[in-house]
Amino acid sequence: AALCSREDVTADIPLLRVPDTLKAAQTLAAAYRRRFSLPVIGVTGSAGKTTTVAMTCAALGSMRPLRTADADNGQIGMTFTLFNLDASYGCAVLEMGMSLPGELARLSEMGRPVIAVINGIGTAHIEFFGTREKIRDAKLEILSGMPEDGILIFNGDDPLLWDLKGALPRKTLFYAQHNPAADFLAACESTDGVSVLQFTKP
């Protein structure tokens, strides 16, 4: 079967005619996601999302995580990633991108993350927002689909995120390389061409 928004289209398969195929697909994806109780981690930020997803999946390898394809993080890509869920996965790590206000809220409400990572606020798509503060506010839409006991993980070296310490209605943890007040300090060491990233709690 297929979703179709045009009356003049015919096919040899059943067609479900809807006003907006993307909205219909997202409604179906959200309903399908609700069939699974597995934990979901949502990852957003202005840069480094795909790397963060890859590293998170490597750390959670024993749980066989479902992940979004590299940088396929938009309204269509993440929607169809959710349709790949099945009982063989122990968790999901979803990259959530956005370029306009409201987009991240829709992704979060579909994916329903229990943990959300924001790895930084840059200037990507600033032409649609005007300021980095407004980009940050749009990134915070990731809270839209989270439960009340969800956990936020923020880059504590980013002043725009650090300013939110104690201000959000979720447990919030900060990691950093240079901010000694963060909850976890990151250090990367390279030996013989092998890099090791470690997090320590001060």
Segments and roles (model prediction):
Residues 1, 5-12, 117-202:
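Acidic, Mg2+-coordinating active-site environments of NTP-dependent enzymes
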Residues 31, 35-36, 59-141, 148:
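ATP-dependent carboxylate-amine ligase catalytic core
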Residues 15-17, 40, 65-67, 172-174:
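Conserved beta-strand scaffold positions in the cores of enzyme catalytic domains, especially
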Residues 1-42, 51-58, 83:
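Short, basic phosphate-binding NTP loop
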Residues 47-51, 98:
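Residue-level detector of alpha-helix initiation sites
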Residues 3-4, 17-18, 66-70, 94, ...:
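General beta-strand structural signal in soluble alpha/beta enzymes
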Residues 20-23, 28, 71-73, 120-123, ...:
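Short, acidic/turn-prone active-site loops that include or flank metal/cofactor-
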Residues 25-29, 53, 75-78, 104, ...:
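A general structural signal for well-ordered alpha-helical segments in protein cores
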